[in-house]
């Protein structure tokens, strides 16, 4: 059973994933070079996802270990402390390939714990 805190965190992670997914519809990797607003929105939501992941307890992470939670937290640190040196290829890969699986995994955890 999920705690209220865990469910809340997962719901917020899902929300931030959806924001990224909505923002990249019709976008390409090149969009990140050409549209700083899109880049900033994606990075902000990646940062928020990482912050939320850091609030998950060790027991939760051990139980729900099909997602690389430490990498998610690490990506937050890269975005937060990149100081203009963020690898845009990595940001694009995260946004276009990894965010959907994170959202689906979080949704499945909530569904399994109804």
Language-model-detected regions and their locations in the chain:
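Solvent-exposed interaction patches of small proteins and small membrane subunits
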Residues: 1-114
């Amino acid at each position: 059973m999920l705690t209220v805190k865990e469910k809340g965190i997962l719901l917020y992670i899902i929300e931030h994933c959806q924001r990224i997914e909505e923002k990249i519809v019709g976008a390409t990797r090149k969009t990140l070079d050409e549209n700083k607003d899109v880049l900033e929105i994606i990075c902000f939501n990646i940062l928020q996802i990482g912050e939320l992941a850091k609030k998950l307890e060790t027991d939760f992470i051990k139980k729900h270990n099909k997602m690389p939670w430490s990498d998610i937290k690490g990506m937050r640190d890269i975005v937060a402390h990149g100081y203009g040196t963020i690898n845009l290829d990595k940001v694009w890969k995260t946004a276009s390939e990894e965010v959907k699986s994170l959202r689906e995994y979080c949704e499945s955890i909530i569904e399994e714990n109804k």
